[in-house]
Amino acid sequence: FAKLFDIKELRVYDLYPAAAEKFKEDMKDAVKGDIIVCSDPKDASIGDVVVGFTQSKDKYIKDEWIKPGQIVFPMGSYTECEDALLLNADKIIVDHVGQCMHRGALHDVVADGKLKEEDIYATIGDVAVGRKPTDAANERIICVPIGTGAMDIAVAGIVYKRALEKGLGGTFEFL
């Protein structure tokens, strides 16, 4: 993944500092830029892209931390972003509208009636093919990739192709 992007700086925060240090050590050869372990999540939110990989039930990514030109990816089925961030974002982009409305980052604001399907700007596919433009340099964008089977298959296909090109992997029989 890091080879696809020119990462100049990667900021990492974990409730458990030892876990953040281990991540830094594990990723040092994969990331060309500096990996900075932060002592609080606010410091880790500085950058073009903010990604939450967590099992947190606490809404720790604050509205006031995210500036125009940043995109936030709350990954998985958790609620990392405070409601104000979701409601004040310039655009919300999702991989699958139906799934994102019922679990993960958007669940609470949808359940409270504060966000509706028509508030979703686009799907990732709409943006990727140019049907729905974005101004990533000037907007606060929330992208909620809750996960779909189609996305898993597409990514698996890319990984498989690259593994073949590099002579990696092997075959086995399913029982």
What role is predicted for each listed range?
Residues 3-27:
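NAD(P)-binding Rossmann-fold cofactor-contacting core
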Residues 7-8, 67-70, 89-90:
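A short helix->loop->beta-strand "cap" motif at the edges of active sites that frequently abuts
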Residues 47-48, 89:
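An anion/phosphate-binding loop that grips the pyrophosphate of nucleotide cofactors and donors
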Residues 49, 55-75, 83-84:
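Rossmann-fold NAD(P) dinucleotide-binding segment
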Residues 55-58, 77-78, 98-99, 148:
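Short glycine-rich anion-binding loops that position phosphate/pyrophosphate groups of nucleotides
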